[in-house]
């Protein structure tokens, strides 16, 4: 099985219990109200799967994140590095910092929420630092990044056109993953979560 980063549709966002994100949605809306912000209710419905359409997002986290963490520490402030690596729920709107919810995220006892508009410039800085190539898949409907990095296309490109990104493909994978996740969340107006 492993760990995946996926887009969350309205049906899953509003479903309570283990099968959905309703507990986190309710807790988040409570925190937003405390901050004088409107509730987050405009989550898009599940889209039909069409490869390359950019309507869904699913990637598998396979490689080690050690090199990615080192890259974050080298190019971001400590706070930004922790933001990039520490969230468990990404939302498509701006937040003034992270929000920690007392809701099990599936991987920890709490859910750490970050706004994609805050994550995106951090991911863009990392992409610039490694010179992520334009051939990196833009849409991540069904393991497109995972396949590109794991099945040889990235390695072939790194051999043909060397660059900092090709020196550590595992690190480049995570740079691309977080960049594309933030872009997808903003473009589709949907949350992103690990499952």
Regions from the PLM with identified roles:
Residues 1-184, 188-195:
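Acidic (Asp/Glu-rich) sequence patches and key acidic residues
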């Amino acid at each position: 099985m492993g760990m995946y980063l996926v887009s969350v549709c309205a049906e899953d966002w509003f479903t309570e219990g283990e099968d959905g994100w309703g507990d986190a949605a309710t807790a988040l809306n409570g925190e937003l109200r405390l901050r004088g912000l409107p509730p987050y209710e405009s989550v898009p419905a599940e889209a039909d799967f069409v490869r390359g359409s950019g309507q869904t997002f699913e990637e598998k986290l396979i490689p080690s994140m050690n090199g990615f963490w080192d890259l974050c520490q080298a190019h971001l402030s400590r706070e930004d590095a922790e933001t990039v690596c520490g969230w468990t729920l990404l939302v498509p709107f701006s937040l003034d910092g992270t929000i920690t919810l007392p809701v099990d995220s599936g991987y920890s006892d709490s859910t750490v929420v970050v706004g994609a508009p805050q994550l995106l410039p951090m991911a863009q800085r990392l992409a610039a630092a490694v010179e992520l190539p334009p051939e990196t898949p833009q849409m991540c409907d069904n393991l497109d990044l995972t396949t590109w990095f794991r099945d040889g296309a990235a390695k072939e490109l790194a051999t043909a056109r060397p660059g900092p990104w090709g020196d550590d493909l595992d690190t480049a994978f995570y740079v691309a993953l977080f960049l594309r996740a933030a872009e997808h969340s903003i473009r589709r107006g949907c949350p992103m979560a690990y499952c």
